[in-house]
């Protein structure tokens, strides 16, 4: 997350090109954001020293502030990869997606979102989502059409699909954090470690506190026998590995080559 105190800077052609390209993507992993920044310097100011990414983004955010837009930093819930998304702060509703989707498509997203938030796992099956098609507002939608719309949500990085089930993409979590907290106050889950919104993660079987998988990994990094940070009972779940960009670079792994694994709350 960006801090509240920002250094007011002056937007150059480098910043403007970066912002324009980020807008076309909506959300990018940090490694891609750094590559994008270097590309923009190469195109517009190849002799300049590449500014520290945090300062570079703060300069852009200081200009975007009056437009109620912000480049926000978050992490993916499944493996803790840093991501950056261009977030619209002017509205806290699903209507911020309105320029890309029709009314009945937005309502389908709301239905999927509600199922995801209400679930214990952070996932909603395609079957359960499609069963709600008859309840959609606006133009009638067939199940085949709804399947296509769900794939559009995936392509636009609002949802992630794993083994026929859907969960929220990091972009959706960054964009809709406030909306989710206000709309589903009784169902919303918060990580015991970072206090951020939690969709998928692990939970203590004794006291019920929940933790993001990356937070689990970091908290228990040096523990041979992990115990709950709240009640001190034994933590029975498998502790995932912490995302390490250097290690990933060395092994030459890319996310596209990884077989997606199911991240479940327990």
UniProtKB/Swiss-Prot annotation:
Kindly state which reaction or reactions the protein catalyses: S-ubiquitinyl-[E2 ubiquitin-conjugating enzyme]-L-cysteine + [acceptor protein]-L-lysine = [E2 ubiquitin-conjugating enzyme]-L-cysteine + N(6)-ubiquitinyl-[acceptor protein]-L-lysine
Return the InterPro entries for the record: C1-like_sf, Nse1, Nse1_RING_C4HC3-type, PE/DAG-bd, WH-like_DNA-bd_sf, Znf_RING, Znf_RING/FYVE/PHD
Q: Which GO biological-process labels does this protein carry?
A: DNA damage response; double-strand break repair via homologous recombination
**Broadest EC class?**
transferase
Q: Which domain of life is it from?
A: Eukaryota
Which stretches does UniProt call biased (Basic residues)? 256-266
| PROSITE patterns in UniProt | ZF_RING_2 (PS50089)
Q: Where are the zinc fingers (RING-type)?
A: 191-232
Major localization class: nucleus
Which E.C. number(s) belong to this protein?
2.3.2.27
Q: Where in the chain are disulfide-linked cysteines found?
A: none
The segments labelled Interaction with NSMCE3 in the record are: 1-102
Q: Where is the composition biased (Basic and acidic residues)?
A: 243-252
Region annotation (Disordered) maps to: 243-266
Q: What are the entry keywords? A: Chromosome, DNA damage, DNA recombination, DNA repair, Metal-binding, Nucleus, Telomere, Transferase, Ubl conjugation, Ubl conjugation pathway, Zinc, Zinc-finger
Q: Name one Pfam family in it.
A: zf-RING-like
One term of GO molecular function: ubiquitin protein ligase activity
Q: Hey, which family's this protein in?
A: Belongs to the NSE1 family.
Q: What does this protein do?
A: RING-type zinc finger-containing E3 ubiquitin ligase that assembles with melanoma antigen protein (MAGE) to catalyze the direct transfer of ubiquitin from E2 ubiquitin-conjugating enzyme to a specific substrate. Within MAGE-RING ubiquitin ligase complex, MAGE stimulates and specifies ubiquitin ligase activity likely through recruitment and/or stabilization of the E2 ubiquitin-conjugating enzyme at the E3:substrate complex. Involved in maintenance of genome integrity, DNA damage response and DNA repair.
Quaternary structure, from the entry: Component of the SMC5-SMC6 complex which consists at least of SMC5, SMC6, NSMCE2, NSMCE1, NSMCE4A or EID3 and NSMCE3. NSMCE1, NSMCE4A or EID3 and NSMCE3 probably form a subcomplex that bridges the head domains of the SMC5-SMC6 heterodimer. Interacts with NSMCE3.
Task: Please report the name of this protein according to its UniProt entry.
Answer: Non-structural maintenance of chromosomes element 1 homolog
The taxonomic lineage of its organism, from the top, reads:
Eukaryota, Metazoa, Chordata, Craniata, Vertebrata
């Amino acid at each position: 997350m960006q801090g509240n105190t920002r250094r007011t800077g002056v937007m150059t052609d480098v910043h403007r090109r970066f912002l324009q390209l980020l807008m076309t993507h909506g959300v990018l992993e940090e490694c891609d954001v750094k590559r994008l920044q270097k590309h923009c310097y190469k195109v517009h100011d190849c002799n300049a020293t590449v500014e520290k990414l945090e300062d570079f983004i703060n300069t852009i955010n200081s200009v975007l502030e009056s437009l109620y837009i912000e480049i926000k930093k978050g992490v993916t819930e499944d493996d803790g990869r840093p991501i950056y998304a261009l977030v619209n702060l002017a509205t806290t509703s699903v209507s911020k997606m309105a320029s890309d989707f029709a009314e009945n498509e937005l309502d389908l997203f709301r239905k999927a979102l509600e199922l995801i938030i209400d679930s214990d796992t952070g996932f909603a099956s395609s079957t359960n989502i499609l069963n709600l098609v008859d309840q959609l507002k606006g133009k009638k939608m067939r199940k085949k059409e709804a399947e296509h719309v769900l794939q559009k949500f995936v392509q636009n990085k609002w949802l992630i699909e794993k083994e026929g089930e859907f969960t929220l993409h990091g972009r959706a979590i960054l964009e809709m954090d406030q909306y989710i907290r206000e709309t589903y106050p009784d169902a919303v889950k918060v990580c015991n470690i970072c206090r951020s919104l939690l969709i998928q993660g692990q939970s203590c079987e004794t006291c019920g506190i929940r933790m993001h998988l990356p937070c689990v990994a970091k908290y228990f990094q040096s523990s041979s026998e992990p115990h709950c940070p709240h009640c001190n009972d034994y933590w029975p779940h498998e502790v995932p590995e912490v995302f390490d960009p250097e290690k990933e670079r060395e092994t030459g792994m890319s996310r596209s080559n990884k077989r997606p694994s199911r991240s479940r709350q327990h």
